[in-house]
Swiss-Prot record:
Family: Belongs to the succinate/malate CoA ligase beta subunit family.
Cofactor: Mg(2+)
Annotated metabolic or biological route of this protein: Carbohydrate metabolism; tricarboxylic acid cycle; succinate from succinyl-CoA (ligase route): step 1/1
Catalytic activity: succinate + ATP + CoA = succinyl-CoA + ADP + phosphate; GTP + succinate + CoA = succinyl-CoA + GDP + phosphate
Enzyme class: ligase
Protein name: Succinate--CoA ligase [ADP-forming] subunit beta
Job of this protein: Succinyl-CoA synthetase functions in the citric acid cycle (TCA), coupling the hydrolysis of succinyl-CoA to the synthesis of either ATP or GTP and thus represents the only step of substrate-level phosphorylation in the TCA. The beta subunit provides nucleotide specificity of the enzyme and binds the substrate succinate, while the binding sites for coenzyme A and phosphate are found in the alpha subunit.
Gene Ontology biological process: succinyl-CoA metabolic process; tricarboxylic acid cycle
Organism this protein belongs to: Psychromonas ingrahamii (strain DSM 17664 / CCUG 51855 / 37)
């Protein structure tokens, strides 16, 4: 689950971290009122969407008049913002953040993720603030400094100081950075975060550090104990198909291809997508129906896949371990008949009662192709959408 910038900064405030004075707004008049409350003669107004690249897309602007605030609000509220991180439709802008301006002398980067290899929260810091950290990692990886947090003892002040030295900070900046580092580490653990990013973390002309931006992702598996955060989730930013899938405990991620994929098991699903690519096709989605591939779940999976107008064929790849393939075949047939599938459906079954499952599919009389192997299934799917 992702948070908006204004929500992330509210958490920063709660943990004692320095952020600009800012107010979230729903209307143009609220934006003007917010500027009056903040004071000053210049403000930054930002579209609130779950995507990066807002500045380059026109979703962040420095304004010096109240009319400028109104104009920006009227331009974006109720519209969709398209950035390099969104699809062609973009994401809806329902809120704006009006903030005071900061006198920036230098921009830094500070973020944290869970490193699966070391099984520890890892902080990353760089002098290259204000740009995509992925680009820095690719072009100048030596400019990224890391600190791994031992889960037994937690983040230590010396780790913050060490990062501060590597960033070239001095004087009171070192103490400020260490406080931010320790606060973020506590926030990361207590709120079950999976990603945290401040880009940029700025040094002002007065030698103060301020969290100028904030990005937070929360582990969706921890929502049962993060109910307050779950309550502020902005579902308008989520893909409708992904929300539908979550209701049925299906793991679905929309992509931009033409071959819908339905698979049981995340690893098998990724392998299926790879082999579709290998044979010249493009998957329209990642969909893992899990171990309980019942008729009801398969039916909902078909509905989700076919709600994408780009889907020209559906590839079903099921390994029958706990679940028998003949029952899966019955479920696929029932789902195809109920949903009224009009595109070709290619089914590859392997494992428990696979031969019986393929026989049931072949005798169904529906537009279902029983593939002999995964390679055959991928070739049939690519052929069905007009590929070679």
């Amino acid at each position: 689950m992702n948070l908006h910038e204004y929500q992330a900064k509210q958490l920063f405030r709660e943990y004692g971290l320095p952020v600009p004075q800012g107010i979230a707004c729903d209307t143009a008049e609220e934006a003007v009122s917010a500027a009056s409350q903040i004071g000053g003669d210049k403000w930054v107004i930002k579209c609130q969407v779950h995507a990066g690249g807002r500045g380059k897309a026109g979703g962040v602007e420095l304004v010096s008049t109240k009319d400028g605030l109104r104009e920006f609000a009227h331009k974006w509220l109720g519209k969709n913002l398209v950035t390099f991180q969104t699809d062609a439709n973009g994401q809806p802008v329902n809120k704006l953040l009006v903030e005071s301006c900061s006198d920036i002398a230098n921009e830094l980067y500070l973020g944290a993720v869970i490193d699966r290899a070391s099984q520890r929260v890892t902080f990353m810091a760089s002098t290259e603030g204000g740009v995509e950290i992925e680009k820095v990692a690719e072009e100048t990886p030596e400019l990224i400094h890391t600190a791994m947090i031992d889960p037994l003892v937690g983040a230590q002040a010396y780790q913050g100081r060490e990062l501060a030295f590597k960033l070239g900070l001095s004087g009171k900046q070192i103490g400020q950075f260490t406080k931010i580092f320790l606060g973020l580490a506590t926030l990361f653990e207590e709120k079950d975060l999976s990603l945290l990013e401040i880009n940029p973390l700025v040094v002002t002309a007065q030698d103060d550090l301020i969290c100028l931006d904030g990005k937070i992702s929360i582990d969706s598996n921890a929502m049962y104990r993060q109910k307050a955060l779950h309550a502020i989730n902005d579902t308008t930013q989520d893909d409708e198909r992904e929300m539908h899938a979550a209701q049925w405990e299906l793991n679905y991620v929309a992509l931009d291809g033409s071959i819908g994929c339905m698979v049981n098991g995340a690893g098998l699903a990724m392998g299926t997508m790879d082999i579709v690519h290998l044979h010249g096709g493009n998957p329209a989605n990642f969909l893992d129906v899990g171990g309980g591939a019942t008729k009801e779940r398969v039916t909902e999976a078909f509905k989700i896949i076919l709600s994408d107008d780009n889907v020209k064929a559906v590839l079903v790849n099921i390994f029958g371990g706990i679940v028998r393939c003949d029952l899966i075949a019955d479920g696929v047939i029932g789902a195809v008949a109920e949903v009224g599938v009009t595109v070709p459906v290619i089914v590859r079954l392997e494992g428990n009662n696979a031969d019986l499952g393929r026989k049931i599919l072949a005798e169904s009389g529906l537009n279902i192709i029983a593939a002999a192997s995964l390679t055959d299934a991928a070739e049939q799917a690519v052929k069905a959408v007009g590929g070679k």
